[in-house]
Design a protein with these regions (language model features):
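NAD(P)+-binding Rossmann beta1-loop-alpha1 motif at the extreme N-terminus of oxidoreductases
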Residues: 1-54, 64-67
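Rossmann-like NAD(P)(H) cofactor-binding subdomain of soluble oxidoreductases
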Residues: 59, 65-110
Length: 110
């Protein structure tokens, strides 16, 4: 079974949002953080930290980490926390992966 919430983008904003959602014990959402590369996914799973973008913050055990956009295909909602310039590329990758859930773009700049 896939996540109920997927967050695409493991920069500071995406990591913080994914951690926040995964820590909501009362809601118990299943949250997946989708990253660009297998190497990044492996490192985040192994270290349970994203010190490059969010130093000193542990990733919750409940947070799944994957590099495959198809992991988001079963999500009820997808948050994309990437730069605006990546919007077209990320949306196309998600569509090719079969993602049909509402997509909320969390961009705060270019």
């Amino acid at each position: 079974m896939g996540p109920s919430v997927a967050v695409v983008g493991a920069g500071p904003w995406g990591t913080a949002i994914a951690c926040h959602l995964a820590e909501r014990a009362h809601a118990r959402p299943s949250v997946a953080l989708i990253v660009r590369t297998r190497e990044a996914a492996d490192a985040l799973r192994r270290e349970r930290r994203n010190d490059r973008y969010l130093p000193g913050v542990a990733l919750p055990d409940a947070l799944a980490i994957d590099d495959d956009p198809a992991r988001a295909a079963s999500a009820g909602i997808v948050f994309a926390a990437t730069p605006v310039k990546a919007l077209e590329d990320v949306a196309a990758k998600l569509a090719r992966a079969g993602v049909r859930a509402p997509l909320v773009w969390l961009s705060k700049g270019r």
